[in-house]
């Protein structure tokens, strides 16, 4: 309810972005969705982009990074932008560097006043996995102030496939009943939450 959607669209991450296609060395068709928003209270306008880069094509990821920035200029050269998604590369890859090296965008992780990231963003459905790699990113125009950044690593518990059993817990009051459940993640990626100010 805070924003009005002025315009929206999609384009393909390929050499022919206006036509359904697979780009460069990618193995799957990939798109980027975008919206032009206006804040009802302040009149502030911005572009929001969300994409899913290819998981195999290295050239496709780099070229997609350049293409998205071209589209930002085409759709609103004077408008600040937010770019989110599963980039399928971490902060060491050349496509990541292509997004942050020219001053058009900055990584909200690097820019945040307060950061909570005890793990990376990909977990492969295993809550015990740990990585420092962040493959899900939130890039923003320099105009935005990044107040907070967080990788939310919450898990939930469900009964094991073999059934529930009483947990072997020592020094537990007899009034407490604890069953041995399994920790699970809602997705193979952890969500990223960012608080921005403009």
Segments (PLM) and residue ranges:
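Structured beta-strand-rich core segments of catalytic domains in phosphoester-bond hydrolases
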Residues: 1-45, 148-152
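Metal-dependent phosphoester-hydrolase catalytic domains
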Residues: 3-6, 63, 72-81, 89-198
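Conserved hydrophobic/aromatic beta-strand scaffold that supports enzyme active sites
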Residues: 10, 32-36, 50, 137-138, ...
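Hydrophobic pocket-lining residues within nucleotide cofactor-binding pockets
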Residues: 13, 51-53, 87, 144
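A short local loop/turn or secondary-structure capping micro-motif enriched for an aromatic residue
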Residues: 14-17, 56-58, 155-160
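Generic anion/oxyanion-binding catalytic loop in active/binding sites
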Residues: 24, 57, 182
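His/acidic metal-ligating clusters that form di-metal
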Residues: 29-49, 58-99
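Short coil/turn segments at secondary-structure junctions
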Residues: 52-55, 178
């Amino acid at each position: 309810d805070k924003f009005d959607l002025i315009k929206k669209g999609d384009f393909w991450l390929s050499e022919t972005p206006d036509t359904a296609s697979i780009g460069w060395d990618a193995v799957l068709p990939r798109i980027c969705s975008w919206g032009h928003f206006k804040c009802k209270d302040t009149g502030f306008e911005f572009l929001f982009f969300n994409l899913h880069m290819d998981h195999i094509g290295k050239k496709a990821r780099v070229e997609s990074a350049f293409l998205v920035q071209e589209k930002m200029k085409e759709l609103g050269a004077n408008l600040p932008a937010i770019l989110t998604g599963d980039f399928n590369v971490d902060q060491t890859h050349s496509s990541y560097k292509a997004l942050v090296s020219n001053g058009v965008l900055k990584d909200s992780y690097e820019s945040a006043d307060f950061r909570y990231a005890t793990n990376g963003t990909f977990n492969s459905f295993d809550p015990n996995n740990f990585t420092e790699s962040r493959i899900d990113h939130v890039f923003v125009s320099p105009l935005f102030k990044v107040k907070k950044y967080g990788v939310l690593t919450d898990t939930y518990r469900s009964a094991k496939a073999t059934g529930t059993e009483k947990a072997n817990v020592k020094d537990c009051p007899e009034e407490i009943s604890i069953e041995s459940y399994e920790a699970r993640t809602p997705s193979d990626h952890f969500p990223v939450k960012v608080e921005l100010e403009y």
